[in-house]
């Protein structure tokens, strides 16, 4: 069995990993799964999307998930179950309001001799309270800041 999980949190524009993750996700989703020549290959695809709005905060939350599983027959020497299962999934969540924007995305790939239970998909219901109620410190201007005099440290 092999498994790759790739996570990335984008908290500000210009994140150097954002392009790499998008590129990786596109490659992973477009990659042909399974044995293309197998006549008995079975494929299952799932697409889900959910949205929440918070009028009191002028905020929105979105979650989308795409998952594809392919299986095909294989000799018993390769797989005791007689089949190989490959799954690829891409999940993306966004939370935005006038003062902030949070984006998170993850890609997942697995290959196994037996069907694996699906990993838990993040839900907006469990994710948005973290973003919604996270306290932020008030911004201050330079006129309100008091600057301390630099201290010299002598080493001897």
Curated annotation (Swiss-Prot):
The modification Phosphoserine is found at residues 71, 79, 137, 140. Residues 57-156 are annotated as: RNA-binding. The N-terminus is involved in homodimerization. The C-terminus binds ssRNA. The C-terminus is phosphorylated. Poleroviruses are transmitted by aphids directly into phloem tissue. The virus replicates most efficiently in phloem companion cells and then moves through plasmodesmata between companion cells or into sieve elements for long distance transport. This is Movement protein P17. It is found in: Host cell junction, Host plasmodesma; Host mitochondrion outer membrane; Host Golgi apparatus; Host chloroplast envelope. Together with movement protein P3a, facilitates long-distance movement of virions in host. Transports viral genome to neighboring plant cells directly through plasmosdesmata, without any budding. The movement protein allows efficient cell to cell propagation, by bypassing the host cell wall barrier. Binds ssRNA. Residues 38-54 are annotated as: Homodimerization. InterPro entries: Luteo_VPG (IPR001964). Belongs to the polerovirus movement protein family. It comes from Potato leafroll virus (strain Potato/Scotland/strain 1/1984) (PLrV). Residues 144-156 have a biased composition (Basic residues). Residues 55-80, 131-156 are annotated as: Disordered.
């Amino acid at each position: 069995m092999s498994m790759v999980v790739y996570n990335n949190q984008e908290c500000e524009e210009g994140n150097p990993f954002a392009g790499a993750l998008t590129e990786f996700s596109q490659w992973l989703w477009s990659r042909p799964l399974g044995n293309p020549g197998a006549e008995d290959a079975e494929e299952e695809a799932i697409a889900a999307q959910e949205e929440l709005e918070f009028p009191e905060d002028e905020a929105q939350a979105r979650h989308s998930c795409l998952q594809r599983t392919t299986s095909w027959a294989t000799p018993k020497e390769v797989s005791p179950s007689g089949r190989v299962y490959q799954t690829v999934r891409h999940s993306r969540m966004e939370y935005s309001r006038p003062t902030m924007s949070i984006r998170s995305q993850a890609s997942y790939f697995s290959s196994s001799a037996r069907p694996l239970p699906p990993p838990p998909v993040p839900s907006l219901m469990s994710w948005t309270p973290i973003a919604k109620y996270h306290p932020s410190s008030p911004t201050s201007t330079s006129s309100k800041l008091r600057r301390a005099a630099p201290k010299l440290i002598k080493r001897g």
